[in-house]
Curated annotation (Swiss-Prot):
Domain of life, per lineage: Eukaryota
Organism, scientific name: Xenopus tropicalis (Western clawed frog)
Presence of keyword Repeat: yes
Pfam hit, one: WD40
Stretches with biased composition (Acidic residues): 100-116
Compositionally biased intervals (Polar residues): 14-24, 46-60
Segments for region (Disordered): 1-141, 564-604
Lineage: Eukaryota, Metazoa, Chordata, Craniata, Vertebrata
UniProt-recorded name of the protein: DDB1- and CUL4-associated factor 8
C-alpha cells in the first residue's frame, strides 16, 4: 500500500509537472504545449507500467479533459494558486494566427493606401514640375527675346547738379536743350492734365513752332487749337472733312495762320486762321482715291508739303500755285500698287522723303531723281531681312526721320519697331530693334523724343506708352496712357521736356517730368508677356481683322457716323466758308465719300 501510495503520489507529481511549470522554464506558448504533451504521454506510460491496469489511463484522460475544460473558462494569462501561468496553448495559437492575418490584411491595406497616396503625390509633383518647367521655359524664352539685341544702359551724360551749377554761373546756354534729352527727366514723366473738347477718338496732335499751341483732330470732324498750358481751346472749327480727321499740322513759318489737314475721305484741306482766333475758311487742295493718313512738312517751307494715300499716290502741294497739287509718284512693287499709310520728309535733305504702307519695305525717294521706269522711281529700300520672305504680311504703320535725318524709324503692324541708317545702301539691314509693345488694332504712330532723338516713343494696344533709350534699346519709361485701350499718337514738344499723347479716349493727355522718383516699371514684364503671347497667337491663327476688338471699334464708329449725320442735318456741318472748288482734284472721284465709315486701322 505504501508503495502504491508513493507511486500514486509519483503519478500525481508527474502529471502536475506536465500541466504546470515555473516561468523560468517557460520559453513560449508553443514550447509549453509540446513539453506538456510529452510529459502527459510519459506519465501515462509510467502509470500503466506500474499498476498493470487501465486506471492510470482513465485518470490521465480525465485529468486532461478537466484541464481542457478549465482552460476554456480561464484566461490563458491568469495566474493560479501556485504562482504559475496556466495557458490554453491551442486557442492562443488560433487567436494569434487570426489576429496576425487581420493585422497583415490591415497592414497590406495601409501599405496600398500609402502607396496610392505616394503615387498621387508623385503625379501631382510631376504635374507641378511640368507646369513650373513650362512656366520657367516661357519665362526664359521671354527673357531671351526681350534681352536679345539690347545693350546695358550707358551712364547718363547729363548731370542735374552740375548742369544747374553751370547755368547759375552763366557757362551753360543749352540747359533746357540738354535737359530735354536726359534719361532722368524721361523716367519721371507723369500725367499733368487732360484736354477735353472732342466727342470722338483723337487721331492727330501737332505743336506749333514756338510750342505754345497744340492742334488736335478727331473722329468728330473737328479741329481744336489748344493753349495747352492753360488747358483752354484757342479756337475750334469744323474741318470740312466728311470722315475721320487723321492729321492736322501747322505749316512752318506761317505765323500759325495755316493748318493742313487730311482724312479718311481722301481729301487734303487747308484751313486759314485769323489773328482773332477764328477760322476764315477751309478749302480742298487735293483728293486721294483712298484714305489719306499722313502729311509731310518741309522744315522751313510755309507753302509746300506732301501727302500720301491708300491709293498709293504721293502728291506734292504748293499753295502758291493755281493748281496746288501735282502727282509726284505712284508707289508700286512689281507693277502692283502699294497703299500708303505714312510719309516723312528728310529734315537734312528736303528733296528726299520716305514712305511706308501695305508691305514690308521702307522706300526712299528723291524728288529730283524720280523715274518710274527705273526701279519704280525708288532711290533705295530698307526692310528687316527676316521680313523680306516672311509669309506673314507685314505693314508699316508709321515712319519718321531723326532730328538730323541720319536715321529712319519704322513701326510694323504686329511686329517690332526698327531703326535704319538712312545713309546705308539699298537693302541694308536694320541697326536697332525695339520690343515690348503691340501694334495691331490701329494705325499706330511712332516718334523720336529728345532734341538729339535720344529716345523712341510709341503707343500700344495695351493702352500703355513705351519709351526706349535709342542707343541701348532698353525700356526706360512705361505709362498708362489710354483708358480706351489704345494709344495712337505721340507728339513731343519742340523745346521743352513735354509729351502730348492721344488715343481712343476723347481727350488729349499732357505729360511732364514732375514725379519725385524715377519710374520703377511696375507691371512691365507682365504687359510685355501678354503682348508677346497675343501677337504669337494671332500669327499662328492668322486672325481676321474683324475680331471682337475690331467689331467694338466698328460699332463705336457707326454710332459716331449717326451723330455726325444728325449734326449735318441740323446745319452744323461745314459752313459756307468751306470751298471744294480746287482744280487739283478734278482727276479724282468723290463717289466713295458717303460710304460706310471705317475704323482708322482697317484698310480702305
Amino acid at each position: 500500500m505504501s508503495f502504491s501510495g508513493e507511486m500514486a503520489n509519483g503519478k500525481t507529481d508527474v502529471a502536475n509537472s506536465g500541466f504546470s511549470s515555473s516561468p523560468e522554464d517557460m520559453s513560449g506558448a508553443e514550447e509549453g504545449k509540446e513539453n506538456s504533451s510529452g510529459i502527459e504521454v510519459e506519465a501515462s506510460d509510467v502509470s500503466l507500467s506500474l499498476t498493470g491496469d487501465e486506471t492510470g489511463t482513465t485518470q490521465a484522460e480525465s485529468r486532461d479533459t478537466c484541464s481542457e475544460t478549465s482552460g476554456e473558462d480561464k484566461d490563458s494569462d491568469s495566474m493560479d494558486d501556485t504562482g504559475h501561468y496556466s495557458i490554453n496553448d491551442e486557442n492562443r495559437g488560433n487567436d494569434q494566427s487570426h489576429s496576425e492575418d487581420e493585422e497583415e490584411e490591415e497592414e497590406e491595406e495601409e501599405d496600398e493606401e500609402e502607396e496610392e497616396a505616394v503615387r498621387h503625390r508623385k503625379r501631382a509633383q510631376r504635374k507641378r514640375a511640368n507646369r513650373d518647367q513650362d512656366s520657367s521655359d516661357e519665362e526664359r524664352a521671354l527673357e531671351d527675346w526681350v534681352l536679345s539685341e539690347k545693350t546695358p544702359l550707358p551712364r547718363p551724360r547729363w548731370r542735374a547738379l552740375r548742369a544747374l551749377r553751370q547755368r547759375q554761373m552763366g557757362s551753360s546756354t543749352r540747359f533746357i536743350y540738354d535737359a530735354c534729352g536726359a534719361r532722368g527727366f524721361v523716367q519721371r514723366f507723369r500725367l499733368l492734365h487732360g484736354l477735353d473738347g472732342h466727342s470722338g477718338c483723337v487721331n492727330t496732335l501737332h505743336f506749333n513752332q514756338r510750342g505754345t499751341w497744340l492742334a488736335s483732330g478727331s473722329d468728330d470732324l473737328k479741329v481744336v487749337v489748344w493753349d495747352w498750358v492753360r488747358r483752354k481751346p484757342v479756337l475750334e472749327f469744323e474741318s470740312g472733312h466728311k470722315s475721320n480727321v487723321f492729321q492736322a499740322k501747322f505749316l512752318p513759318n506761317s505765323g500759325d495762320s495755316t493748318l493742313a489737314m487730311c482724312a479718311r475721305d481722301g481729301q487734303v484741306r487747308v484751313a486759314e486762321l485769323s489773328a482773332t482766333h477764328c477760322c476764315k475758311n477751309t478749302k480742298r487742295v487735293a483728293q486721294h482715291k483712298g484714305a489719306s493718313h499722313k502729311l509731310a512738312l518741309e522744315r522751313d517751307s510755309p507753302c509746300t508739303f506732301l501727302s500720301a494715300g491708300e491709293d498709293a499716290v504721293v502728291f506734292t502741294i504748293d499753295l502758291r500755285q493755281d493748281r496746288p497739287a501735282s502727282r509726284l509718284v505712284v508707289t508700286k512693287e512689281k507693277e502692283k500698287k502699294v497703299g500708303l499709310y505714312t510719309i516723312y520728309v528728310n529734315p537734312a535733305n528736303t528733296y528726299q522723303f520716305a514712305v511706308g504702307g501695305r508691305d514690308q519695305f521702307v522706300r526712299i525717294y528723291d524728288q529730283r531723281k524720280i523715274n518710274e521706269n527705273v526701279n519704280n522711281g525708288v532711290l533705295k529700300k530698307f526692310c528687316p531681312h527676316h521680313l523680306v520672305t516672311s509669309e506673314a504680311k507685314a505693314n508699316i504703320t508709321c515712319l519718321v526721320y531723326s532730328h538730323d535725318g541720319s536715321e529712319l524709324l519704322a513701326s510694323y503692324n504686329d511686329e517690332d519697331i526698327y531703326l535704319f541708317n538712312s545713309s546705308h545702301s539699298d537693302g541694308a539691314e536694320y541697326i536697332k530693334r525695339y520690343k515690348g509693345h503691340r501694334n495691331n488694332a490701329t494705325v499706330k504712330g511712332v516718334n523720336f523724343y529728345g532734341p538729339r532723338s535720344e529716345f523712341v516713343v510709341s503707343g500700344s494696344d495695351c493702352g500703355h506708352i513705351f519709351l526706349w533709350e535709342k542707343s541701348s534699346c532698353q525700356i526706360v519709361q512705361f505709362m498708362d496712357g489710354d483708358k480706351g485701350g489704345v494709344v495712337n499718337c505721340l507728339e513731343p514738344h519742340p523745346h521743352l521736356p513735354v509729351l502730348a499723347t492721344s488715343g481712343l479716349d476723347y481727350d488729349v493727355k499732357i505729360w511732364l517730368p514732375t514725379a519725385k522718383e524715377p519710374t520703377e516699371l511696375n507691371g512691365l514684364k507682365e504687359v510685355i508677356k501678354k503682348n508677346k503671347r497675343e501677337r504669337d497667337e494671332d500669327s499662328l491663327h492668322h486672325t481676321d481683322l474683324f475680331d471682337n476688338h475690331m467689331l467694338w471699334f466698328l460699332m463705336h464708329h457707326l454710332r459716331q457716323r449717326g451723330q455726325r449725320r444728325r449734326r449735318r442735318d441740323a446745319g452744323l456741318g461745314a459752313g459756307d466758308a468751306d470751298s471744294d472748288d480746287s482744280p487739283s482734284s478734278s482727276d479724282s472721284s468723290d463717289d466713295d465719300e458717303d460710304g460706310p465709315d471705317r475704323v482708322q486701322c482697317i484698310p480702305s
